[in-house]
């Protein structure tokens, strides 16, 4: 049995958790989040300086809260983990410095965790977790990627967005429609009242230099522009903007693109399991469509529990436990943070000479 205290401060969610691995299962002893969404909403997006300050204010209380909720103390903890990349540098530093300080104070190993690895491991918190090999659709505000996970939990990116992430597209379209931030929940709320067949928007593709298209990659900037032009056209005619129908049509085409390319890769490469993680994976339309289309190809779908799709510390703790179970060495206490760092480089976070 191993227990990890984990911290997540990569963007605008301050989070702490205590996660245990016992008899082959991951168990969340306590999980606490302080969201800054309302504070950033008035700016239409995350303000890095505000995010860092709120992490500083919230984290001590969150750590105290998870120990109080769980009924354990530091003597029961085997390691301390924190997100170190990618994300907002100032925000990452708050969690990393806090974790390394606690590691020194309590003489516990420290593990620096890649944020995307945390998302990948969030599916392991479900009642029926997937077993590698499988394909992961990681779809969030900052990332839209297809990642193949092999039997020994090695990661290979096999598809990506070449411009906006899907979640970023949701935020931008919500803003131009005059809806609230974050855009994903706002658009989903209006889409439930609309007709997804009302407007036909393009499914962006990425061209190859030699001709043709990358079959498993994504592009959402053209879709965002198409929605903008449609809104401008409707306004020029003096008509009322049909928010529900626009939201439903946009949500539907994003879901179709994500589902079609994910299922195609899994089918083409003989993978029988497909996993969805990340904030956008909480979208009901996307979840239903993925299950339906994957079933047609005899592909099983696994999803992170909705509560763990958005940023949280439980997924970071789970990723740390996976590392510990596999025999990965702790990170150096000299490991810093990085705003950008590729997932396939994540093994470098555990070298005696850290990458940053």
UniProtKB/Swiss-Prot annotation:
Its EC number is 2.3.1.234. Keywords: Acyltransferase, Cytoplasm, Iron, Metal-binding, Transferase, tRNA processing. The keyword Signal does not apply. GO terms for molecular function: iron ion binding; N(6)-L-threonylcarbamoyladenine synthase activity. Coiled coil: none annotated. One of its GO terms (cellular component) is cytoplasm. Required for the formation of a threonylcarbamoyl group on adenosine at position 37 (t(6)A37) in tRNAs that read codons beginning with adenine. Is involved in the transfer of the threonylcarbamoyl moiety of threonylcarbamoyl-AMP (TC-AMP) to the N6 group of A37, together with TsaE and TsaB. TsaD likely plays a direct catalytic role in this reaction. NCBIfam families: gcp_kae1, T6A_TsaD_YgjD. This is tRNA N6-adenosine threonylcarbamoyltransferase. It comes from Prochlorococcus marinus (strain SARG / CCMP1375 / SS120). The lineage of its organism: Bacteria, Bacillati, Cyanobacteriota, Cyanophyceae, Synechococcales.
């Amino acid at each position: 049995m191993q227990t990890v205290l984990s911290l997540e401060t990569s963007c605008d969610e301050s989070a702490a958790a205590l996660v245990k691995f016992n008899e082959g299962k991951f168990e969340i002893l306590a999980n606490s989040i302080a969201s800054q969404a309302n504070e950033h909403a008035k700016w239409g997006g995350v303000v890095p300086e505000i995010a860092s300050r709120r992490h500083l204010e919230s984290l001590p209380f969150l750590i105290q809260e998870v120990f109080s909720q769980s009924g354990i103390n530091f003597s029961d903890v085997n390691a301390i983990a924190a997100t170190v990349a990618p994300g907002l540098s100032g925000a990452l530093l708050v969690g990393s410095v806090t974790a390394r300080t606690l590691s020194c104070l309590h003489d516990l190993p420290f593990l620096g965790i890649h944020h995307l690895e945390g998302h990948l491991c969030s599916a392991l918190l479900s009642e029926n977790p997937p077993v590698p090999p499988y394909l992961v659709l990681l779809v969030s505000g900052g990332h839209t990627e297809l990642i193949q996970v092999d039997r020994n939990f090695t990661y290979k990116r096999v598809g990506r967005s070449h411009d906006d992430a899907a979640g970023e597209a949701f935020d931008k379209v919500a803003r131009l429609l005059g809806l609230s931030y974050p855009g994903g929940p706002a658009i989903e709320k209006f889409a439930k009242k609309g007709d997804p067949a009302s407007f036909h928007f393009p499914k962006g593709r990425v061209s190859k230099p030699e001709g043709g298209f990358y079959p498993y990659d994504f592009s959402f900037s053209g879709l965002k522009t198409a929605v903008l032009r449609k809104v401008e056209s409707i306004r020029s005619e003096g008509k009322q903007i049909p928010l529900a129908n626009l939201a439903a049509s946009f949500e539907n085409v994003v879901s179709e693109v994500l589902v079609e390319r994910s299922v195609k890769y899994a089918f083409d490469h003989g993978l029988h399991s497909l996993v969805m993680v990340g904030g956008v994976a909480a979208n009901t339309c996307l979840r239903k469509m993925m299950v339906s289309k994957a079933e047609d190809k005899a592909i099983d779908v696994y999803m992170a529990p909705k509560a763990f799709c958005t940023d949280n510390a439980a997924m970071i703790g789970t990723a740390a436990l996976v590392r510990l179970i596999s025999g990965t060495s702790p990170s150096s206490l000299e490991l810093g943070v990085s705003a950008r760092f590729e997932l396939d480089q994540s093994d470098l976070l555990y070298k005696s000479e850290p990458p940053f």
